[in-house]
Amino acid sequence: MKLFIVLVAGMPGAGKSIVSKAARDLGLPVYNMGDVIRMETSRLYGIITPETMRETSRRVRKLYGEDYVARKTIEQIKEKRGVIVVDGVRSLVEVEVFKKYAETVILAVHASPKTRFERIRKRNRPGDPDNWEDFVKRDLTELQFGLGNVIALADYMIVNEGSIEEAYRGAYNILKKLVEKNAKDNSDS
């Protein structure tokens, strides 16, 4: 069975973790690209804040290339087969790295800035902004990496302005179809 990668993209707080939960419920492995930056931030600064996360993101891409986080993620998935989910792709450069490695699709999750800000304040994850100004700075950083281009070119889109259940159902149904398609494609080969 070949590797098939579902690349999940979305602005912070859009609901990418709902896609990850649906994937896990379907038995799919999930890899979070943000974990690479969180680990590197912790190593470099000993503390994870919005500022240290932004600086680490810029620094590793400047020192090691725009594709650094994707390459580090591929190191984690290189022995995998079947459908896997990679959460947090941020640029078309990263998408190209994955496309060279395996068949891919992009699943984008979208929510308005106001909705995302409220979610981020509630989840209280290390490195998350706790005020509107930092939230906007983080959004601008994400957009500078090219995240908007990835979302614009997505193969599938979930608009997540409603309930968690609605977003989960949408994600689950899309992922289930992709798993079924992958199984059929592999049985045909």
Curated annotation (Swiss-Prot):
<dbReference type="GO" id="GO:0005524">
    <property type="term" value="F:ATP binding"/>
</dbReference>
<comment type="similarity">
    <text>Belongs to the UPF0200 family.</text>
</comment>
<keyword id="KW-0067">ATP-binding</keyword>
<protein>
    <recommendedName>
        <fullName>UPF0200 protein Smar_1234</fullName>
    </recommendedName>
</protein>
<feature type="binding site">
    <location>
        <begin position="10"/>
        <end position="17"/>
    </location>
    <ligand>
        <name>ATP</name>
    </ligand>
</feature>
<dbReference type="InterPro" id="IPR027417">
    <property type="entry name" value="P-loop_NTPase"/>
</dbReference>
<dbReference type="Pfam" id="PF13207">
    <property type="entry name" value="AAA_17"/>
</dbReference>
<keyword id="KW-0547">Nucleotide-binding</keyword>
<dbReference type="InterPro" id="IPR022970">
    <property type="entry name" value="NTP_hydrolase-rel"/>
</dbReference>
